[in-house]
Every structure is written in structure tokens, then in C-alpha cells.
Amino acid sequence: MVATSDNQVYNIPDNLRSFAPVLKKSSIMKVIVISTSLRTGSNSDMLADKFIEGAVAAGNEVEKISLTDKDIRFCKGCLACQKLGKCVIKDDANDIMQKVLNADAICWATPIYYYEMSGQMKTLIDRMNAMYSLDYKFRDVYLLTTAAEDEPDVPKRAEAGLCGWIDCYPKSRLAGTLFCGGVDAPRTIEGNKKLHEAFELGKNV
């Protein structure tokens, strides 16, 4: 089943039912997928959707959070969150943080801008600073990236930036990454083999 950020839960679509038995698990994983691109027809968002299909096919509960319609402002560095356990800024960041805290696995999807993660992804990471003093469930963290450039080292800085966040949560780890280069205009990733790789990565969460 799939849950959206509106807390709606969907059954596995008919076209995925043939994949449902691929992996037997002792328990269902709760997976949060955060798609950070704000562009319609985003290539990284399409990678995220394939990752979700794979995770659902493996029997997991998946919720996709798109930042497209979210209000997430910049961190002010006041550190009040360390005492309160939440941010004092009243926008969507606190709700997303609670979902991340209670997830078993997290997948970030971002376009690469100037060889780094998107600004909105970094802003959300900064705003979840309250988690540093809280207990958390997540263990495995995944990163999906896309870019116009196709050199293999294009996503390295984004991966390093995410690892800096992961290092603050010793029980978690970077469990997998996937990069698709050579995709610039919206939806140019259609038909790319990386979509299947994203499905397989999600299936093995």
C-alpha cells in the first residue's frame, strides 16, 4: 500500500500485483520518500516514483512527500528547537520532520544544481535540526539524483552533504544511491534504464 502526504492510503495497483511476492519480509517497513524538485515533470521525481513502485511491490508501506506545495522557510539558527523538540517557525517542516522520525527508511530525491543537492533539500535538512536531540527510528537512507551532466562524479558533493546529515544520527547509514545523468528537460528520463534500477533499489529496501 502507498500513503500520500495527505494521509491517504492506496492499495497496490493492478500493474504491480505481479511483483508483490518478490520479497518476503518478517515485518512491513515504513518508508518515507521526499521528492525535493519543484519542477513539473521532474526527472528526479520520476526516479522517486519508480523507487516507490519497487518498495510497494516488496510489501512496504510508502508515503511520498513532494516539496512542490510545501512552505519551508530558512533556519534562523536560534537553536530553540534543541530545547523544544520542534522548530518555532510555523510552516510544513515540523510535520515532515515527525514523519521522518517515525520512518524505518528514508529516500531523498533531488536534481543536482551546481554539483550539489537542491536548495530546498538543504533547507529542509537544516530545518529538521530538532531531530538531533530526539529519538529516531530510521536506519537506512537512500539518495536518488539526476542532472544534465553525465560524468559519474556529478552527484558526489550531494552525497557528501547528505552523509554529513546521516553522520549526526549514528544508528543510520547511507544504504544506497542512484544517479541518472544526461537528463535536462522535464521527463527526458522516460525510457531510461535508470528507472528500472530505481525500481530494483526500492524493491530491496
What are these model-predicted stretches?
Residues 71-73, 150-152, 185-186:
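A short beta-to-alpha transition loop/helix N-cap that caps and shapes the active-site region
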Residues 36, 67, 145-148, 180:
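Cofactor-binding loop segments of dinucleotide-utilizing enzymes, especially the Rossmann-like FAD-
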Residues 2-110, 115-131, 190-205:
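N-terminal beta1-alpha1-beta2 submodule of the flavodoxin-like/Rossmannoid cofactor-binding fold
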Residues 162-183, 189, 199, 204-205:
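A charged, well-structured terminal subsegment
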Residues 29-32, 105, 142-143, 178-185:
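A short small-residue
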Residues 153-156, 187-192:
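Short, solvent-exposed loop/turn segments at secondary-structure boundaries
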Residues 119-120, 132-177:
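Short, glycine-/small-residue-rich phosphate/pyrophosphate-handling segment
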